[in-house]
């Protein structure tokens, strides 16, 4: 959990969640693009992350190309880039978590933030994440160049998983799972 000083001096804690769509071989991307388009997964991502700060690496920002509405967009980057004023640019994960914990004006501190990619950002944050929201896409992508870290069953408990569904546009099967860090 990230923490921040509250207005009365108390510590505010914020849970860190990771969200990703992952192939059976843990592939998540190729040439800085997603490997598939699954409408239900895009809707799920929007529903789960709406209203929460989202943290992403610069390459993920480039692949999206715009701020995602209804969420504080925080981009980890070593170099400042042209972006709308609403996009928060930070140099590292620690600064991203600190920025995520700052509440919007006249609002309570966020209870959670989502790490939305890419591979390097997932690698740097999985050891301290509290939950994983994983869309398991039942395919293997041998020519992928970006991968999600292994989900170690000694560390993660699968709290829930939806039934397997099939995308009507591309025939890919997928399910939504939530993993919780074991105590």
Regions found by a protein language model. Give the residues of each.
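Short hydrophobic transmembrane-like helices used for membrane targeting/insertion
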Residues: 11-12, 102
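Extreme N-terminal starter segment of soluble prokaryotic enzymes
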Residues: 13-17
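Flexible, gly/pro- and Lys/Arg-enriched active-site loops
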Residues: 19-183
């Amino acid at each position: 959990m990230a923490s921040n000083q509250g207005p009365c001096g108390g510590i505010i804690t914020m849970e860190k969640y990771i969200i990703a769509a992952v192939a059976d071989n843990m592939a998540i991307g190729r040439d800085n693009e997603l490997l598939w388009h699954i409408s239900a997964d895009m809707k799920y991502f929007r529903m789960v992350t709406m209203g929460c700060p989202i943290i992403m690496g610069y390459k993920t920002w480039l692949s999206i190309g715009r701020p995602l509405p209804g969420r504080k967009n925080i981009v980890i980057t070593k170099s400042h880039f042209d972006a709308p004023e609403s996009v928060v640019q930070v140099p590292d994960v620690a600064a991203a978590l600190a920025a995520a914990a700052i509440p919007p004006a006249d609002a309570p501190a966020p209870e959670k933030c989502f790490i939305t990619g890419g591979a390097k950002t997932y690698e740097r944050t999985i050891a301290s994440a509290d939950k994983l929201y994983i869309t398991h896409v039942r395919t293997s992508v041998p020519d992928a160049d970006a991968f999600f870290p292994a989900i170690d069953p000694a560390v993660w408990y699968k709290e829930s998983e939806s039934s397997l569904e099939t995308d009507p546009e591309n025939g890919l099967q997928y399910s939504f799972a939530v993993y919780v860090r074991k105590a």
